[in-house]
Amino acid sequence: CNEGGHFAQMLALKDLFAKYDSVVLTDNERANYNIPALKNVKAIEYAMSFANKRKELTKNKDKKMTHASYLGSYFGLTKECYAACKKYRPKVIISTGSNIAVPLCFIAKWMGAKFVYIETRAKVYNKTISGKIVERFADKIIVQWPEMVEVYMGRAEYYGTLV
């Protein structure tokens, strides 16, 4: 999960964490402060290449992210995700979205794991870019607004909001 709202939504899954041994893969450097509240988290892995590139661009407003640098940092993110998945061999990967969701979806499919995508609560009437990409491959899509079930043409399930 990414930092901000995506991370907060992941933390809202605390009852699920209590039932299963889990590994958290995030680009949120502050995860160490919040993860101890979750039970059964065996490890925290960081996929920082994409987040670091974003921070670099935020600090230097004159610099723009070129397609090549974007793809390069995304390739780095994919390598980090693959390394974590290879190390822990998950049976199920749950993603609360954003940049990390796409590589995790394809890695899950390649490794034979189930992939559950939780669309962000911020989207009420249309899909995120990540949602558009992973929807054909995800084993389950969970949305946080009833209207989004129709947006995903019945392929998504609604259980309410996480936060």
Segment roles from a protein language model:
Residues 113-163:
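Active-site-proximal region of nucleotide-activated glycan assembly enzymes
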Residues 1, 21-73, 147, 159:
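Conserved nucleotide-sugar phosphate-binding/catalytic loop shared by glycosyltransferases and other
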Residues 63-91:
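An amphipathic, basic-hydrophobic alpha-helix
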Residues 82-92, 102-116, 132-133:
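Glycosyltransferases and closely related glycan-assembly transferases
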Residues 6-18:
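Short amphipathic alpha-helix
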Residues 96-100:
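Short His-centered aromatic/hydrophobic patch
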Residues 43, 92, 139-140:
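Well-ordered beta-strand positions
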